[in-house]
From Swiss-Prot:
GO molecular function (one): metal ion binding
InterPro entries linked: aa-tRNA-synt_IIb, aa-tRNA-synth_II, aa-tRNA-synth_II/BPL/LPL, Anticodon-bd, Anticodon-bd_dom_sf, Beta-grasp_dom_sf, TGS, TGS-like
Binding site for Zn(2+): 333, 384, 510
The encoding gene: thrS
Protein name: Threonine--tRNA ligase
Purpose: Catalyzes the attachment of threonine to tRNA(Thr) in a two-step reaction: L-threonine is first activated by ATP to form Thr-AMP and then transferred to the acceptor end of tRNA(Thr). Also edits incorrectly charged L-seryl-tRNA(Thr).
Domain TGS: 1-61
Any Pfam family hit: TGS
Keyword Aminoacyl-tRNA synthetase carried by entry: yes
Catalytic activity: tRNA(Thr) + L-threonine + ATP = L-threonyl-tRNA(Thr) + AMP + diphosphate + H(+)
Cofactor: how bound: Binds 1 zinc ion per subunit.
Superkingdom of origin: Bacteria
Source organism per UniProt: Prochlorococcus marinus (strain NATL2A)
Length: 641
């Protein structure tokens, strides 16, 4: 006789085992129709699974966060059902939920084309319209092995063989199609309405390049057609803002096959890069950082001591010279410790904050490379703070101020913060972990910030805080990090003399604001859609003469504006001024100056903005006040159209 306790405290008594489906039906037909799964004593189960003991339950619908994940996972199985009907020879591997949707890895002799995706999507809709029930059967690994052997599903068998014999496996049945999963899944296909298949890519089985390359079909799924439409609209807008397209359109950078994962910066793009670097340098100087420069190529012995050789050797570029093996540095931290180690340090010297715009190389897989967002050569706005245990909280507080100052400058006001704490496998005493985690959490609380806790997600050498920003499309980009490190300073013999005269190992705080310049510029390009605020625009002013006889006045105006410190260019091509205005407006240049006979006669300029606003005629000195004000707004100007 199980006693079922509902979320509002109501108790229901039953003479025998009962299911979520039955409980929902008793409460009301609307809830019964909406029920996707149940949470029973904290565990998610299918609506048809019998509950035999006293339990606290919650009925999960699409309104719950878990509901959307269940819908998406069920769509992966529906995709498998459609694929097996259309392509019976296909072998199904895995189909998990991902952000915004799902995918399924499939082995098939032919490459899936866009037309194939349309065909599969059509079949999925037909299956949904059949409004069939999704069955579930709990079996042993041995039984599952029989089922998938009969069906020739080699990848399912590979998974089953690694499941202990005493565990159970859930088989989900979409009519004649059978798949395996932890579940739960929707009880009926009527819950599967709003979806779209998006693309196909390649993926190695189990992520191992020695295994077969599979075809990964991606799909997106939502609770309603309205949400699906909104998502597809965001995707369409994101494609328009793709930094690779805009990089080409505005001649900012390019990549090419001869240097995969490396960036060819064009003059305009490099101007943005230098402005960004100068801004970060100027800002961190106010926070008492000392800039350093460390070697690009370092003997493997240092990487062995730091632990990177064992953990990251495959991701490092190496070279040999005079029988010595070197690595092109993938990160700056071991080198910064070498700088710290030069000369005796006292507790009075701490904290020491060493910063570097360090060029790093990592041997990322070619398939993972993506414009500026994922590269092999990148520059980090990297710094390492050497401090005592007692100084951690204050240093983290200062870094929080720094991060928010920088992000606000670019117009990013929505910042997500996560604190990751100790994992099971870790170095350092519980006491130092307690102190560090407390220091980080109290630093966040002291700033009145909302943050979320990720228990067990910290690195083995210390807890960390991650800062992620939301762009104008509500996409989340993880950029800033401050990471406590108890391990590396000890491995590389960093030390200082404490107040008692004893040698102690400092704590090292790894920290970055942007993450990498390349990626952050990619984020900015997409966020602004190439419409950079005046202070970041590679060309701030374009000067155009109406006729050739105005050219000299154009050069005079340019010289004066450049002397003021502005980035001004001249267009004296033999083209109509209207054509030039349209062209430079399309290039998103903030201010356009036109000089004709009238302007020249009155020692004035005619000023227009890239938004098409005519500011009228004025002196260059008056224009200087306008552009100074525009520059001072920085990211607050935030024209992201």
């Amino acid at each position: 006789m199980p006693i079922i306790t509902l979320p509002d405290g109501t108790e229901k008594k039953y003479d025998s085992a009962v299911t979520i489906d039955q409980i929902a039906s008793e409460i009301g037909p609307g809830l019964a129709k909406a029920a996707l799964a149940g949470r029973v004593n904290g565990e998610l189960i299918d609506t048809c699974i019998p509950i035999t003991q006293n339990s606290h339950i919650q009925i999960i619908t699409s309104k719950d966060d878990e509901g959307l994940e269940i819908i998406r996972h069920s769509f992966a199985h529906l995709l498998g059902h459609a694929v097996k009907q259309l392509y019976p020879e296909a072998k199904m591997a895995i189909g998990p939920v991902i952000e915004d949707g799902f995918y399924y890895d499939i082995s098939y002799k032919d490459t899936f084309t866009p037309d194939d995706l349309l065909k599969i999507e059509k079949r999925m809709k037909e299956l949904v319209n059949r409004d069939y029930s999704v069955g579930v059967e709990i079996v042993s690994p041995e039984k599952a092995k029989e089922v998938f052997t009969d069906r020739g599903e080699i990848f399912k068998l590979d998974i089953v063989k690694n499941i202990p014999k005493n565990e159970i496996i859930k088989l989900y049945k979409h009519q004649e199609y059978i798949d395996m999963c932890r579940g739960p899944h929707v009880p009926n296909t009527r819950h599967l309405r709003a979806f779209k298949l998006m693309k196909v890519s390649g993926a190695y089985w189990r992520g191992d390049s020695n295994n077969e390359m599979l075809q990964r079909i991606y799909g997106t799924a939502w609770k309603s057609s309205k949400e699906l439409k909104e998502y597809l609209s965001r995707i369409e807008e994101a494609e328009k803002r793709d930094h690779r397209k805009l990089g080409k359109k505005y001649s900012l950078f390019h990549s090419q096959e001869e240097a995969p994962g490396m960036v060819f910066w064009h003059p305009k793009g490099w101007t943005i890069y230098r402005i960004l670097e100068d801004f970060i340098r100027e800002t961190i100087t106010k926070y008492d950082y000392q800039e350093v420069k460390s070697p690009q190529v370092v003997d493997r012995s240092l990487w062995e001591k730091s632990g990177h050789w064992d953990k990251f050797k495959e991701d490092m570029f190496t070279t040999t010279s005079e029988n010595r093996e070197y690595a092109i540095k993938p990160m700056n931290c071991p080198c910064h410790i070498q700088i710290f180690n030069q000369g005796l340090k006292s507790y009075r010297d701490l904290p020491i904050r060493l910063s570097e715009f360090g060029s790093c190389h990592r041997n990322e897989p070619s398939g993972a490379l993506h414009g500026l967002m994922r590269v092999r050569n990148f520059v980090q706005d990297d710094a390492h703070i050497f401090c005592t245990d007692e100084q951690i909280q204050e240093e983290v507080q200062n870094f929080i101020d720094l991060v928010f100052e920088v992000y606000k400058t670019f117009g990013f006001d929505s910042i997500l913060i996560k604190l990751s704490t100790r994992p099971v496998k870790r170095v350092g005493s519980d006491d130092i972990w307690d102190k560090s985690e407390k220091a980080l959490s109290e630093a966040l609380d002291s700033k009145g910030l909302d943050w979320s806790l990720l228990p067990g997600e910290g690195a083995f050498y210390g807890p960390k805080i991650e800062f992620s920003l939301k762009d104008c499309l509500n996409r989340v980009w993880q950029c800033g990090t401050i990471q406590v490190d108890f391990s590396m300073p000890q491995r590389l013999n960093a030390s200082y003399i404490d107040i008692t005269g004893r040698k102690q190992t400092p704590v090292m705080l790894h920290r970055a604001i942007l993450g990498s310049f390349e990626r952050f510029i990619g984020i900015l390009i997409e966020n602004y859609s190439g419409n950079f605020p005046t202070w970041l625009s590679p060309i701030q002013i374009m000067i155009m003469g109406i006729t050739d006889r105005n050219n000299e006045a154009c050069f005079t105006a340019k010289d004066k504006l450049v002397d003021f410190g502005f980035r001004a260019e001249i267009d004296i091509r033999n083209e109509k001024v209207g054509f030039k205005i349209r062209e430079h407006t399309m290039q998103r240049i903030p201010f356009l100056i036109i000089i004709g006979d009238k302007e020249e006669e009155n020692s004035e300029i005619s000023v227009r903005t890239r938004e098409g606003k005519d500011l009228g005629n004025m002196s260059i000195d008056k224009f200087k006040l306008i552009i100074d004000e525009s520059i001072s707004k920085k990211g607050i100007q935030g024209n992201q159209s």
